[in-house]
Amino acid sequence: MINSIKYFEEECISRFEKLEDKFMKEPTKLAEYVYGLTDELHRLGLEMIKESLETMDMMLQKSPVRLEHWVVEAHSPKQLTTSLGDVVFGKTLFTSKETGKSEYLLDRILGIGPNERITEDAEAKMLGEAVQTSYRRGGEETSLMSEVSRQTVKNKIHQLEFPKNEEKPDRKKEVDYLYIDADEDHISLQFREKRGDLTENENHQKNNSLITKLVYVYEGIENESPESKRHCLIKPHYFCGVNTGEENLRFWDEIYEYLESHYELDKVKKIYVNSDGGSWIKSGIKRMAGVTHVLDEFHLEKYLTKLTSHMKDSRDEAAEKLRTVIRSRTKGEFEELVDELEGYLEGDRGIKRMEEAREYILANWTAAKTRLERRDGVIGSSTEGHVSHVLSDRMSSRPMGWSIVGAEKMAQLRAYYLNRGDMLELVRYQEKELPKASGGEYDVLSSTQILRSEKNRHEELGKYVDSISHSISSQNKKIVYFNAHIWDL
């Protein structure tokens, strides 16, 4: 810290004074004053980080504990991109006396992989921006004073692994009704596994469409504020993916596990699933006991319009007749009414459209009935709006192409973000190959294990450190703190 203090005294104070003098002369230049101070404070922060890292490395070099197992091999510079900017510092390569393998011990203590160039805080900022805008913007926002390439952002996102929802409330919640809304977005692929692998059909159209799935669980709807006409979901939780086959079934199992771990399901009167009746949704519904499918209003009205659009001024009356038949009559009576409406067509034009609508409503007959009967607890669905907000805004509203891996990871990242997930915790969740020196053996540790180990060690050493913290200098306290990490080498 001594060098940082000298830097502050010799460089920063004079620059601060110059900035203040300029501001006093031109009081309307407050923005420039703030910008100037911000830049200087950034530089000071980077100097402090650099000095702290080099102090740690020097303590490793001087440590008698380190000397028992490791010898100094070489010194080299390293650049790290932090959320504050790039830090260039010197570090030491050590060689193990037991194994003959070389390693930068400071990297191990910091939890940084051998080829890692971006710190956790910078990566968290990168993900927080990329999930909302683009890979390019994610790279630009990684650091205040530098940036990384869009390819780096893409690689980081493609490598992401997401934690399962294992956090359980202390007490399960009791509610009368639960709602599951499900829908999908269609995105364009650049390729599936590798470039050039998209096939064409007989009409020379590329098979480049991929379904991204959205499911969200909530307890109902309420007004955003007492006087607002806008509604919002109560306690929503989002799930996204591009799962197919067996993966789709596991996707729905994860949703049910969330319900089971957060709610007293035996106290719930009904669980309603609002959807368009897609096959991937119906296969999931079959895996969950006690749920009732409700056809969402958007798709029901869409197909009623297909059945009645040719009726012109009588369109509303015809649509209401169809609703009445669906609500309280039989499939046979519905088909008779559709046949009657087809009789008003001019020639064969429109037959295909009406037959498609007839088949759709018949395939979702019970779900359509439930929607129109408005049974206890049935509420309006918002699937189309949520698909636009959750998936389309980032993945399909602007011209862009994806790979299957990229689409899967971004969909999951969108869900994590909307569930208020902490990006720093997500970065730390990723597995890192960090060797643990113990008799020359190396184990792969996850960041979760590392954090747990650090917590245990703090509990063991904390009482001792606290007992002497009032009687030793600041510099010596740092030595005590850091030596606790060297003892593990």
What are these model-predicted stretches?
Residues 61-80, 368, 374:
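Short acidic, Pro/Gly- and aromatic-enriched capping/linker segments at domain boundaries
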Residues 42-69:
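N-terminal accessory alpha/beta regions
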Residues 1-51, 94-489:
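Catalytic center-proximal scaffold of phosphoryl-transfer enzymes
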Residues 70, 75-78, 82-112:
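Cys/His-rich short segments
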